[in-house]
């Protein structure tokens, strides 16, 4: 069960690696495992690589290197000449349900596999729903026991009239306890020890979406030091279905015998090794030249005081805007840091009883912050919301209130033809709203301790500019249940505005500055920290809390705003072709159209999110400032000379790099296997349980991952599934020490889930599976 990775709910939908539970295996071993248990590829179809080769996207040098890593010595041309014309791979073994030739009934087009997936999925949707319907299943008996009770009633199999009574009688004989069911199922079905573990994993992968949701519940429980049994009970339900379909026949022509033969004969099938070589060559074609270019660049900064400094999130969408800002304002410097700005907070929305974690999902909140409370909804409004959630509201709501919504619908539709307004990211995000304030007694000393560590970690240890912008990011989209996937992942799938408001408020506090000066981190009197928000759908920079500035700072503000507008215009012009707009158009037109994309109900691609991500670079900005990284790189500020004990490097490897790896693998999986790890067609999404996830249509498994429109433009892929290249500027021995202290990052590097490069010397070094550095 540890192989099942969690998937987060819609209101905190962060990118996560669906392969996280397989990280103890090498990448190639995991490819074999996924093929065995789910018929899931860890690569694109081979034809995609051949097309990339013909287009020149895969270089001959990269293919030679990829072949040499496998021990091939015959040269690339001989390998290409041996390319088989027709590939007919042996299919993976089936589950028992798939071995029944009989469909669900003589008049049904469904297979038994479809029936099992549908029944379990609909039951899970009803069981886990807390926010959508007013009627809920009785939870007193437990997840498995309630499912079994449903199966023992005639209505539990209403979609299977031809088999209902037979299955109901078999359900009567199943154990009422999940653990007893698992034991009884193993005894009845007699799975061989050799393939028991992958078979159990295959059972869970049959409803992979709901298994991932159960794994999420277990993850959340683990953060609290607790346990959750839903995933194990889901396994019991899956095994119970296998037992329900087992007719007891054990002859050579029985379904049971076919199932046993399948697993015995196909257990050791492998993923296509040639395609994995193409996959590696595709990665090397980007990674190797970039690593070499980084080694050529100097990390030295001049010592002059910059006119402006701006700290952005490491999100790949920040890189083009940072480059535009530096080109527009040459005396500026930009930095990259995790978008929660080192503040591990949970944020309580006004009027809510729940504090939302707004930090990387790898971490637990350290404290809570909130803004001024909003007025509570009236009784009438609460009653109206309850009516909207009632089982019959889907019909009655349209009949009784449809016309009342007509004017609003017409207004929204008409507004798409005019200049769209800035997104209202939070109802309380207004100049006169209260700042988020720590509620757990976080005093001056604790704030000073936090800030004194954050400033050098962000690269702000030297001379501070008159303006220091702390730039979070957010996106604005309409009619998209997966909108949180476009927000800041480091903020738990929310905008980063509250973090930068909080931190800027601290850094502008005279009392805190006085304490920092005593600690040896004096801030110049004319330095102003200004919170800002990068709107990724339109590449605008929205300044926050400018009304609180001093008169002197407000007098300087128009000049800053003009510089930011110019940088945004340059970034928009460069991004325009990617979203189907003409780069030569007037900036006012581009801005309006990009805003409209975010406000358009029918727009399936308001922005490309993190599509294209392939690089993580931890180095001084001087190392990358001259490079056009094409919006594909997570850029984290790091200067090894300011990190004598290596703790900063360890923290980068353990958190930001792992988060970047998760994002990279989310996009990888949704592209390489959209059937299993993507959420399908965005136009067909229906929300499940208010916040749990989506169905594609109204049937099938819970869909996880990204919609197809997030990685494909209708003509071609917009994301190439390449494993992350993590490029670190630090001496190789220092980097090796940090890896030794962080087992998870080392595991990812040695098992090939990411490629770790040291770009400190004249030529790059890559960390290999044997635990050492080598030249590629």
UniProtKB/Swiss-Prot annotation:
Amino acids binding Zn(2+): 313, 315, 473, 488
**KW Membrane (keyword) present:** yes
> What are the subcellular locations of this protein?
Cell inner membrane
A Pfam family name for this chain? DabA
Q: What keywords are annotated for this sequence in UniProt? A: Cell inner membrane, Cell membrane, Membrane, Metal-binding, Transport, Zinc
Give the membrane topology, semicolon-separated if more than one: Peripheral membrane protein
- GO CC terms: plasma membrane
Q: Which GO terms describe its molecular function?
A: zinc ion binding
The protein's required cofactor(s) are namely:
Zn(2+)
| PANTHER family, alphabetized | INORGANIC CARBON TRANSPORTER SUBUNIT DABA-RELATED, UPF0753 PROTEIN AQ_863
- Record function comment: Part of an energy-coupled inorganic carbon pump.
Sequence similarity: Belongs to the inorganic carbon transporter (TC 9.A.2) DabA family.
Self-association or partners: how does it assemble? Forms a complex with DabB.
> What name does UniProt use for this protein?
Probable inorganic carbon transporter subunit DabA
The protein's gene is named: dabA
């Amino acid at each position: 069960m540890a192989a099942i990775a969690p998937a987060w709910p819609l209101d905190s939908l962060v990118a996560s690696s669906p392969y996280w539970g397989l990280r103890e295996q090498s990448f190639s071993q995991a490819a074999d495992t996924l093929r065995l248990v789910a018929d899931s590829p860890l690569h694109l179809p081979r034809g995609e690589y051949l097309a990339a080769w013909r287009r020149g996207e895969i270089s001959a040098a990269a293919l030679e290197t990829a072949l040499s890593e496998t021990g091939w010595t015959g040269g690339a041309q001989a390998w290409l000449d041996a390319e088989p014309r027709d590939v007919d791979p042996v299919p993976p073994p089936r589950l028992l349900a798939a071995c029944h030739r009989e469909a669900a009934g003589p008049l049904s087009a469904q297979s038994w596999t479809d029936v099992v997936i549908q029944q379990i999925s609909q039951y899970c949707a009803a069981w886990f729903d807390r926010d959508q319907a007013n009627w809920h299943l009785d939870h007193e008996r437990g997840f498995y026991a309630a499912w079994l009770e449903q199966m023992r009633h005639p209505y539990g199999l209403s979609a299977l009239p031809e088999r209902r009574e037979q299955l109901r009688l078999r359900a009567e004989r199943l154990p009422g306890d999940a653990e007893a069911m698992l034991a009884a199922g193993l005894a009845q079905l007699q799975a061989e020890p050799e393939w028991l573990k992958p078979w159990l994993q295959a059972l869970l992968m049959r409803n992979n979406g709901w298994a991932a949701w159960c794994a999420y519940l277990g993850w959340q429980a683990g953060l609290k030091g607790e346990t959750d049994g839903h995933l194990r009970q889901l396994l019991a339900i899956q095994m119970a279905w296998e037992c329900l379909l087992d007719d007891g026949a054990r002859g050579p022509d029985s379904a049971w015998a076919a199932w046993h033969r399948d697993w015995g004969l196909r257990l050791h099938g492998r993923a296509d090794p040639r395609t994995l070589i193409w996959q590696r060559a595709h990665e090397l074609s980007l990674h190797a030249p970039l690593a070499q270019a980084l080694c050529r660049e100097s990390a030295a900064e001049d010592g002059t005081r910059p006119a402006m400094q701006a700290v952005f999130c490491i999100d790949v969408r920040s890189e083009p805007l940072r480059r535009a800002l530096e080109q527009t304002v040459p005396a500026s410097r930009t930095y990259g840091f995790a978008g929660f700005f080192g503040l591990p907070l949970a944020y309580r929305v006004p009027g809510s009883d729940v504090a939302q974690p707004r930090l990387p999902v790898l971490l637990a909140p350290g404290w809570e912050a909130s803004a001024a409370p909003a007025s509570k909804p009236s009784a009438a409004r609460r009653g109206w919301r309850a009516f909207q959630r009632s089982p019959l509201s889907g019909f009655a709501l349209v009949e009784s209130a449809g016309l009342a919504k007509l004017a609003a619908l017409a207004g929204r539709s008409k507004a798409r033809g005019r200049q769209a307004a800035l997104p209202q990211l939070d109802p309380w995000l207004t100049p006169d709203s209260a700042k988020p304030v720590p509620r757990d007694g976080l005093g001056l000393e604790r704030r000073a301790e936090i800030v004194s560590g954050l400033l050098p970690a962000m690269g702000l240890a030297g001379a501070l500019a008159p303006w220091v912008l702390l730039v979070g990011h957010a996106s604005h989209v309409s009619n998209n249940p997966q909108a949180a996937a476009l927000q800041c992942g480091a903020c738990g799938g929310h905008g980063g505005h509250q973090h930068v408001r909080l931190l800027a408020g601290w850094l502008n506090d005279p009392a805190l500055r006085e304490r920092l000066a005593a600690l040896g981190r004096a801030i110049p009197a004319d330095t102003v920290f200004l919170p800002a928000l990068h709107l990724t759908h339109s590449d605008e920079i929205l300044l926050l809390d400018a009304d609180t500035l001093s008169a002197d700072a407000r007098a300087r503000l128009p000049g800053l705003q003009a510089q930011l507008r110019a940088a945004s215009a340059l970034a928009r012009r460069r991004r325009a072709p990617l979203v189907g707009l003409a780069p030569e158009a007037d900036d006012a037109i581009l801005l309006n159209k990009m805003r409209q994309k975010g406000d358009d109900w029918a727009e399936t691609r308001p922005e490309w999110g993190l599509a294209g991500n392939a690089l993580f670079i931890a180095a001084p900005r001087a190392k990358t400032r001259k490079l056009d990284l094409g919006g594909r790189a997570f850029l984290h500020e790091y200067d090894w000379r300011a990190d004598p004990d290596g703790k900063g490097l360890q923290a980068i490897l353990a958190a930001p790099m792992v988060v970047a790896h998760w994002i990279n693998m989310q996009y990888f999986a949704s592209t390489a296997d959209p059937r299993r790890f993507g959420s399908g067609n965005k136009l067909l999404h229906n929300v499940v349980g208010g916040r749990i996830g989506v169905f594609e249509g109204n049937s099938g498994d819970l869909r996880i991952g990204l919609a197809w429109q997030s990685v494909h433009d209708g003509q071609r892929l917009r994301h190439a599934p390449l494993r992350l290249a993590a490029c670190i500027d630090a001496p190789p021995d220092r980097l090796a020490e940090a890896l030794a202290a962080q087992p998870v990052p080392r595991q990812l590097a040695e098992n090939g889930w990411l490629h770790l490069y040291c770009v400190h010397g004249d030529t790059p070094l890559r960390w290999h599976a044997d635990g050492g550095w080598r030249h590629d």
